[in-house]
Amino acid sequence: MFRGATLVNLDSKGRLSVPTRYREQLLENAAGQMVCTIDIHHPCLLLYPLPEWEIIEQKLPRLSSMNPVERRVQRLLLGHASECQMDGAGRLLIAPVLRQHAGLTKEVMLVGQFNKFELWDETTWHQQVKEDIDAEQLATGDLSERLQDLSL
């Protein structure tokens, strides 16, 4: 399980250094093989260990190519999916087209989200967090049953 938000830097070649606390887990569970794709709802990237991505990849063909929304999801997720292998120094090369999509330049937030990571431009990440907190403070609607069961 991946959790927490960590500031990492992209080098001049577009590589990010995976924090040490995740490297062993990624090597053990995925042999350092990762898949990166776009998030279809936010200006960030999704970074999956290969076994986690394969679960999603098995579900994508079940979507109907005749349904425009389902076909769009297939096209966006699979069409942007790019494999990346962690090198001996614990770095991952993020494809240029993906970096451009998320506006990633130098300072990147690596955000653990259970079975995957999100990659955000640092400034965009902080703006998103502020928007999310502001939205929660203004929310007056009823909580879903799942949120009601989540006691913090």
UniProtKB/Swiss-Prot annotation:
GO terms assigned for molecular function: DNA-binding transcription factor activity; transcription cis-regulatory region binding
Subcellular location per the Swiss-Prot or TrEMBL entry: Cytoplasm, Nucleoid
NCBIfam families recorded: division/cell wall cluster transcriptional repressor MraZ
Function: Negatively regulates its own expression and that of the subsequent genes in the proximal part of the division and cell wall (dcw) gene cluster. Acts by binding directly to DNA. May also regulate the expression of genes outside the dcw cluster.
UniProt keyword annotations, A-Z: Cytoplasm, DNA-binding, Repeat, Repressor, Transcription, Transcription regulation
Protein's UniProt keywords contain Ribosomal protein: no
Subunit structure: Forms oligomers.
Gene3D superfamilies with a match to the protein in the record: Transcriptional regulator MraZ domain
Pfam families: MraZ (PF02381)
Subcellular location, principal: cytoplasm
The name this protein goes by in its record: Transcriptional regulator MraZ
PANTHER family: TRANSCRIPTIONAL REGULATOR MRAZ (PTHR34701:SF1)
InterPro entries cross-referenced by the UniProt entry: MraZ (IPR003444), MraZ_C (IPR035644), MraZ_dom (IPR020603), MraZ_N (IPR035642), MraZ_sf (IPR038619), SpoVT-AbrB_dom (IPR007159), SpoVT-AbrB_sf (IPR037914)
GO BP of this protein: negative regulation of DNA-templated transcription initiation
Family according to the record: Belongs to the MraZ family.
Cellular component aspect of the GO annotation: cytoplasm; nucleoid
Entry superkingdom: Bacteria
Occurrences of domain SpoVT-AbrB (ranges): 5-52, 81-124
